[in-house]
C-alpha cells in the first residue's frame, strides 16, 4: 500500500541564502518516502500579500507557513507542507509556499524569477497572488517567467527561437489560479456585471491592431493564453479591519469579514476538487520520489546557470527510475530463485521452468516500475542480465551436481577401492568378483536421489579413471584363459564406448535444450518489448486526444466570452443611440 506522510509543520525545501539556492536534504527524504501520487499546489506573488495565509487554509490549519505582519519578507526560498489530500484517498497534497517577490532588500529580480520558475515547473496548480486588480505589471511579470525563449525550455534543442506548438508547450505547465487580494473594485465591464473568470479573460484579451504599441500590449497576453489554457480567478475582499490584519492568523472566522471567509472557502474547495495530480509529458504520474528528483534536477540546472529543461528533467528522471526498476527486477528474480531452487536440480527442464517463471515475474516488476523507456534500452539491459543469470544458475547447477555426485561416488565406491588396495581381488576369479561388485555399487549409485544432471557424466568419468585398475585385476586373474581375457577386455571396452556415447548424447540434449530456451527467451523478450511499445503509443495517443479536447473546450470558452463581450458592446451602442435620438414634437 502507498505510504502516506503526515507533516505536522512545513519545512524549507529550497533554501535561499544570499540569493543562492540550495536543496534541504531533510525535505528530500520526506518526499522520497511518499509513494502516493502528489497534487502539487504552489503560490507565488509579491511579498506581504497574504500568500502564506491561503496556503495554511489549504493545509486545514490557521498556522504553519509564516504569515508576516511587518513590511519585511518572511518566507525565504520555497517551503513545503505535505498533507493527506482531503478529497482524494491515496493522494498527497503538496503545498509550496514561496518567498515574496519584489523584496527591496534584493539586488535585482534574477533570484525572484528563479523562484517563480521553480514554482511553475514543480506544480500542477499554480496560484498567482496579486493585490487589488489585474494590472500591466502583474501581467508582464507572469509573461517574463513563462516565456520559453527567456527562461524555460520544453525541449533539449539549441534552437531556442523556434516557435513552440501551443498545445505541446501548455502540456508542460500547471493550471493557473489567479487570486486577487483586497479587491475593492466593482466587477463590471461596459456596465455589465461579470464573473471573476470573465474579468480575467477580459484582462488577457488582446487588442486589434498591428502597430508596435498594440504588439507590446498583446504579446504577454497571448503568451499567458498559450501557456495556461486552463485558468481560474478568485477575488478576496479585505479580510478584516486594517488594525486587525497584523493578527490575521490568530483571528477566528467570526472576527473576519463574512464575504472573505466565504471566498476563502470557495477557493479551497476549488483547489481540492479541480487541482490535478502532477504529471509529466507522456502521462507520467508523479509521486514523492519523482518530485524529489525533479527538484534536484531543476535546482542544479539553475544553480549552474543553465536553462531548466523539462525534457532533460524527464529524461534524467527516466534514467534514475528505469535503472532502479532494473535493479528491483533483478532483486525479485534473485529472491524467487533463492526460494524455489535447491541445487542440484534433478533435470535441466525443471531448472529452466523455474527460471522462466521468475524471469516473467521480473519483467513484470520492471514494467510496473519503469517509464519512458522508449528505445527499450533498459529492458534490453534487463534481458541481458537475466540471460547472464540463467547461464550462471545453469553453471552452478552443473557444479553442484558434479560436486554432489563426486562425493557420493567416493562414499559408495570407497570400500571397493580399499579392497582393491588390500589385494582382495588379486586372485583367480577375482576379476568377475570385481565386475560384479562394481555393478552392485553402480545400481546403488543410480538409486540415490537428487544427483542432478551430471549424474551419468560424473559416473562415467569415474569408471574411466578406474579402467586401469580393472585391467590390472584382469591380467592377474589366473583362472581366465588368454582368449577369455581378450573377450573380457573387448566387453569392457564396448561398455565404456557405449557409456561415452550416452554421455555425449546427454550433453547434446542439454545443449539443444539450452538453445531452445534461449530462442524462447528471445521471442518472449521481443513480445514484451512490442507490448511496451504499443502501450506507450496508446498513452501518447490518449494524451494527444485529451489535449485536443482541452483546446476545443478552451476555444469554446473564449469564443463564448468574446460573444458576450461583443453583445455587451452592441447593447451599449444601442443604448447610446437611443439616448441621442432627437425628440420631435408634432
From Swiss-Prot:
List of residues binding GTP: 45-52, 67-69, 181-182, 245
PTM info: Isoprenylation is required for proper subcellular location.
Known partners and oligomeric status: Homodimer; homodimerizes upon GTP-binding, forming a close face-to-face dimer. Heterodimer with other family members, including GBP1, GBP2, GBP3 and GBP4. May also form tetramers (dimer of dimers) in the presence of GTP. Interacts with NLRP3, possibly in its tetrameric form, and promotes PYCARD/ASC polymerization.
Positions bearing Cysteine methyl ester: 583
Region ranges (NLRP3-binding): 1-306
Gene for this chain: GBP5
Location of the protein in the cell: Cytoplasmic vesicle membrane; Golgi apparatus membrane; Cytoplasm
Protein name: Guanylate-binding protein 5
A GO biological process held by the record: cellular response to lipopolysaccharide
Organism: Homo sapiens (Human)
Reactions performed catalytically: GTP + H2O = GDP + phosphate + H(+)
